[in-house]
Amino acid sequence: MSKILVIGASGTVGKPLVELLRGKGHQVVRATSQEPGADQVKLDLVTGEGIATAFAGIERAFVLAPPGHTNQDVLLQPVFAEAKARGLKKLVLMTAMGANADPAAPFRKAEIALEQSGIPYNIIRPNWFMQNFNSYWLHGIVTQGKILLPVGKAKGSFIDARDIAAVAAELVARSDFDNRDFDLTGGEALDHDQVAEALSQATATRIEFQDITNEALLAGLLAAQLPKAYAEFLVVIIGYFKLGYSEPITDAVETITGRSPIRFTQYAKDYRAAWLR
């Protein structure tokens, strides 16, 4: 068994990943912005504080490219340098589906830095999380019974964060997929009317999809206290959703985990309490 660092351990993917790795017998060190504890180190990617301490004795690592920022390549360079110096056996980096489309984009520049580092790696690029519907898009659902997004009839192959964690748990501990990148999707592509119907069925309430403008989405994100730069970034990438870039389906989850991805209807049943407020 290995000593594995999880950067982003308190997040939507990080939490189930930690549980899975511990269940497999690995020693997990959680890196978060919180105060250190018995199995937790404090790490600030913006200042670089705690990077050297976090990697002490580490053999393998999962690294979440930090959300809420637009300079992930700059923030992650010291992480890759420390991992290289420590001789890590594997580093799994999570960015986002489509991150490799533009070589000048911060996500892609971070990926390239890892690819060229000499560290055995995997890059995973998940599509839009199913869990966005019980977080980012939750307010409109519980207050108005509506999914409010500027996406029209476009479809997305939404992925459950638990599947992302399952993939990461396999990749970080194995070498047979070394130095490969994977786009991660669910097993079906749904439009937001279909999503609304699934949520309605799971909750026995009426939930509808309402197409809105980009400006309305931005206003809602800012009202939810998201940083302006990140809110604007979300509006931009949702524009790609509307253009159909989130519809493709891959077999990566099944290839790596040996099972089919979680269906949206199952996600809706598992999280139904989130929308019953």
Where are the model-predicted features located?
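A hydrophobic C-terminal alpha-helical subdomain
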Residues: P16, E215-R277
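Oxidoreductase cofactor-interface core, primarily capturing Rossmann-like NAD(P)-dependent enzymes
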Residues: S2-R30, A38, V46-E49, A56-E59, ...
